[in-house]
Amino acid sequence: MLGTAYWETNRTMLPVEEAYWLSDAWREKNLRYYPWHGRGFVQLTWKANYQKASAKIGVDLIGDPSRAMEPDAAAQILVHGMIGGWFTGKKLADYIDGARVDFVGARAIVNGKDKAAEIAAIATAYLAALPEDQGSIWLRIFKAFWGIITGKKQ
């Protein structure tokens, strides 16, 4: 998830809007899925995906697609969408579980094989940077977060 968020936000780790350096008029003219263009940590696109995310997280993203830029909504879309397979039907557990970590394959959760090796390298760097010891605050935070998302205590 961290590798995906890093990549999809143009390395900012902040929710961004697709082609944020261009005007909204440009997006309206050039993006066939406007106004449901890429937003957030994962670049949620297409009306059907906005409808699905809206129903799942309880935020009206159809009436106001820009709400996908709100950090809380963007985080929920990233996490629940990747775990639940909202984007392509592929889920995080299809590639990462207690026995294996396939960051290259995991790109299929969001966007096929597009830049999979580059994003996998980023994810690997994040994984290596997180301390492994049981006393680590990061490990405890991740385990608590994972438990909330999956409903399983760690």
Which functions belong to the PLM regions below?
Residues 1, 14-18, 88-99:
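Surface-exposed patches in mature extracellular/periplasmic domains of secreted proteins
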Residues 41, 89, 107:
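A residue-level signal for beta-strand positions that form part of recognition/binding surfaces
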Residues 1-82:
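Peptidoglycan-targeting cell-wall enzymes and recognition modules
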Residues 62-66, 73, 90-96, 100:
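Long, well-ordered alpha/beta core segments of mature domains
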Residues 28-30, 55, 72, 89, ...:
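Extracellular cell-wall/glycan-interacting regions and their flexible linkers
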Residues 1-3, 100-107:
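Alpha-helical scaffolds flanking conserved acidic
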